[in-house]
Amino acid sequence: MVKDGAVVDRGVNLAAEYCERLDLAILVSGLGLEVAALVFDMVASGKALHIWSMGDLLHDAIAFLKVCLLDGIVPLLDMDAECELAQVIFNTGLPLHNRLRTLLESALAATNSVPAITAQHALCEEDIVPLVYASMSVMFCSTTLLSNGVDSNLFESIRRSSQALLRSVFELHADQRTWILEEILASLVKLPAQKRAQSVHRVAGGKSV
């Protein structure tokens, strides 16, 4: 019993340490997304034109948005609800959930700011590629974690914003359309059968993919 008790205590300590690190990672990512959204707004409004390194700032902001979505938020939300890490997150209660909600709000602000840039500035391929993959990762995210207490409506807003961003890139960059379509179709094929049903993925005009 003493041994079992020690194992339980160690598990509790590891869970607490994991949540502390996750909380810090979410906090830092949220701050980074706020900075990225600020850069996008400055570029869209023309306020950053006097900054000699505007191109580098924009590139770094796009790269950070891609990393946060593709390598951070989406894998976290796609986590199997039955896995141990997901259970740890569920059991932490409001503090971590509120932090995650704030992160999603920052991600929404950032994704909402990008289409204005794509409409006004000719982006290079180095910036288009991460934007496309970031948008697609959100579009095809299963959001398993959100169905267990975290605000799913907020992520749906991010999904719609990402679809608008991808549509903007697709319309404005004809030379990129072929590979974008190939990646979208490849992602659709990989989806479970129930998620390939009509009405799940819609395009402009109300038609289904």
Model feature map: region roles:
Residues 1-209:
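Eukaryotic alpha-helical solenoid repeat scaffolds
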